[in-house]
Amino acid sequence: MAVMLNSTVGVKLASTDISDHVSSATLSQIFDELEITSLGDTSHKFTKGLEASTLTLDFFNDFAASQITTLLQTNYGTTITAVLIPVKGTAVSATNPLYTVSILINNLTPISGDVASINSSSISFTCNSTVAYATTGTF
């Protein structure tokens, strides 16, 4: 089993590389569970429904032009493309796959923290598409 330090994840939103502002990224691939339990069954049975994935990003707010907070504010209420790769700077492959998904920018936290902390945000975005998994391509 290969074990890796998770410090090289690459994250792009709307083709802008925001990796240098992200402190944590979590892509949760989830499907709705549809119950199909019938009379006579001895346990619940489920089948896959629609995909309902989420992307959670923890990042440092930055209001400069073309930076993350401005990018999100500009796209607030719209759907943009998010691209993630486990090891940025390394070719896309079976051991370094590319994940692409459309996310709805439906919530923002542009101001957060207290007098002694960094202005940062932790936001979960609703995915508006299935998560595409690729072993070829470019980040």
Positions of PLM-derived features:
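C-terminal or internal capping secondary-structure element at the end of a domain, subdomain, or sheet
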Residues: 114-138
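Acidic glycine-/aspartate-rich tracts in secreted/extracellular proteins
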Residues: 60-65, 129-132
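Solvent-exposed edge beta-strands and adjacent loop segments
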Residues: 1-63, 99-122
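Extended hydrophobic/Leu-rich segments
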Residues: 13, 68, 85-87, 125, ...
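Short, acidic/charged, Gly/Pro-enriched secondary-structure junctions
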Residues: 66-106
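Single-stranded nucleic acid-binding surfaces, predominantly the OB-fold ssDNA-binding core
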Residues: 33-37, 86, 127
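Intrinsically disordered/low-complexity terminal segments and short unstructured peptides
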Residues: 7, 15, 25, 77-80, ...
